[in-house]
Amino acid sequence: GVSTRPRAVEGSYMPCFLAGWSQASCLAQILGVPLYEFSHQQGHIAASLWSAGRLDLMQVPHLAWHLSGGTTELLLVVPDGKNVKAEKLGGTSDISAGQLIDRTGKLLGLPFPAGKSIDALSRGSDCRDRYRVKLHGLEFSFSGIQNKAEAFYAATNSPADTARFVMNCIVTCIADATRAALAEKPGLPVVFSGGVASNSMLRERMREFSPVFAEPQYSTDNAMGIAVLTALQEGL
């Protein structure tokens, strides 16, 4: 199995996936075995379900957040037992949660990628300030938070409080959108996937939704999810 594109929708493409596809295609031909192609997003969701011991959700509809460096999307997943079939319900209309975190890291002089550093810094602050992003249906914009973070840091000169401020904003927005989605589709399980889903504050604040999270080390592990999906295709 191999990731061949960011999302399983028409027109989804990034050239970086060609290297993996080329190698996997050659190996499949040499070994005389099938080649199963999936999206990067499908891999992250499957990795979360496997790591959380919830592969049973491959049989039932659920909500899934894909939170990463390039993506912040809320999905309705209607799996068929072998693959993750998803419809986008909402998410960011501009920069992703991961991009916002990395840009905040750059502002604070942190190494790239900044996820772990922002997580550690934010835990050292009790700042409760936040900028509440408005929802438009289930869509929202994170670019305004970046501007607010720059102003906040200029006013406070506190890296820890700024990191906490940004995470307060992100987590509040994700929670608001999740509540709104559950109001439309009550009773569905909520799965969190992607690298940003390893953030400790996010994991704590989402408890009200009885969430399904991957173990932190598997939040960033797309390959594990691709292996799981390949095994399911083979009936293993």
Q: Can you say where each PLM-predicted feature lies in the sequence?
A:
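Conserved phosphate-binding catalytic cores of ATP/NTP-utilizing and phosphoryl-transfer enzymes
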Residues: V33-L63, V228-L229
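Glycine-rich phosphate-binding/hydrolytic loop that grips phosphoryl groups
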Residues: H44-S48, A214-L236
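Active-site nucleophile and cofactor-binding loops and adjacent substrate-binding regions
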Residues: S12-A19, L35-G43, W65-L67, D94-I95, ...
